[in-house]
Amino acid sequence: MFKFALTLTLCLAGSLSLAQHNPHWWGNRNTIVHLFEWKWSDIAQECESFLGPRGFAGVQVSPVNENILSAGRPWWERYQPISYKLTTRSGNEEEFGDMVRRCNDVGVRIYVDVLLNHMSGDFDGVAVGTAGTEAEPSKKSFPGVPYTAQDFHPTCEITDWNDRFQVQQCELVGLKDLDQSSDWVRSKLIEFLDHLIELGVAGFRVDAAKHMASEDLEYIYSSLSNLNIDHGFPHNSRPFIFQEVIDHGHETVSRDEYKDLGAVTEFRFSEEIGNAFRGNNALKWLQSWGTDWGFLPSGQALTFVDNHDNQRDAGAVLNYKSPRQYKMATAFHLAYPYGISRVMSSFAFDDHDTPPPQDAQERIISPEFDADGACVNGWICEHRWRQIYAMVGFKNAVRDTEITGWWDNGDNQISFCRGNKGFLAINNNLYDLSQDLNTCLPAGTYCDVISGSLIDGSCTGKSVTVNENGYGYIHIGSDDFDGVLALHVDAKV
């Protein structure tokens, strides 16, 4: 009997873990966008007016729980919890719930960035949160939850990143480190996440997951409620989990400890795609992109060109400040069938701590748009760049097809097909790409969705005529505005 019960328990745990890799997308949609620091009311409007019509699958939103008020209102104050009340600079609980409902109604899922590892760092005296809650972080006193000192690990600093104990039980940059093995802490975290599930979210991005023991996270995840069927989720659906685990390949705490609990952020993807499109690695090598590069299996990898953290760091990672290379890298990211794709939507920054666009009272301001739909008032909105939202449509059109017809020039010009539904070509050389290439598409004329749009049967950008053998003449000049060309069956003239 014991053996049967143990087997049943293991099977249930395995099935729950597998279910936590499912992002619950509508139809053929398969791209998440991180609307970093947006207000809930603006996200709701964006779902209805842009993301839904453009085929985006979901939105990662900034942390929803009450956070400390920091001088100047830097973005990172959102990562310093005071309580689990749903009041932040982005809005209150009513506005959050309205946003989730409206986005779900148009097929755009919501994934919340959640902070399970810690509470706020030290603050002189009494700290006040965005909902008016008082706390004394230096005493580990957070009455808004409530947490007291006994709910935290003993104070210590991470000085050796190769020491598992320090990484998982000491304070990350001074943030008060919760003890996730505590029954009380577990109950409060589960209560917080279950409340968000009741409001209709589809899942969670778990911040600083590597700083928590995987067995503690497994307990918390497995204790969560199923997703709310009133928001269109099938019965017994589990929340999608993707976990921030920075693993460059030599870490004491490995991504492999978390990959079976849910997806894991694949930081090596971000670094290597940046290296390639910055010219430090020839694009021809991308033919084997994926696990051959040491990446996680596709269904366990949350992939991105940049995120809100590493876009602010020096190094290989690309961001909006290198737009031509960034758009090429994003096109490759969304065209190549590897990983669970997320694109970044940023605000402009001059230094690491730059706050989101705000008014004189330090309230976040809504994005404004020009005649082309691009943002103009401090918001970058990469997701509204035609070259990026068009590739979201490309990715939808070619879903469930494989790479075929790979071509390269032995250097930095490449092309490939996605079955007989899509074709991508990239030129990252300092000379033109001018070549008859196999597009694998049915005969006809296709609109290049990078340089233009198909409107009322006419293409506003380049077009390519494909012959009966699937070949078309592809030209990408070295001085063209964009170094990429994309065709697919839903953009046939």
Curated annotation (Swiss-Prot):
This is Alpha-amylase-related protein. Its EC number is 3.2.1.1. The keyword Disulfide bond applies. Belongs to the glycosyl hydrolase 13 family. Pfam families: Alpha-amylase, Alpha-amylase_C. Residues 1-19 form the signal peptide. One of its GO terms (biological process) is carbohydrate metabolic process. Midgut and fat body. Its cofactor is Ca(2+); chloride. Chloride binds at residues 205, 307, 342. Keywords: Calcium, Carbohydrate metabolism, Chloride, Disulfide bond, Glycosidase, Hydrolase, Metal-binding, Pyrrolidone carboxylic acid, Secreted, Signal. It comes from the Eukaryota. It comes from Drosophila melanogaster. The active site is at 207 (nucleophile), 244 (proton donor). Disulfide bonds join 47-103, 156-170, 375-381, 417-440, 447-459.
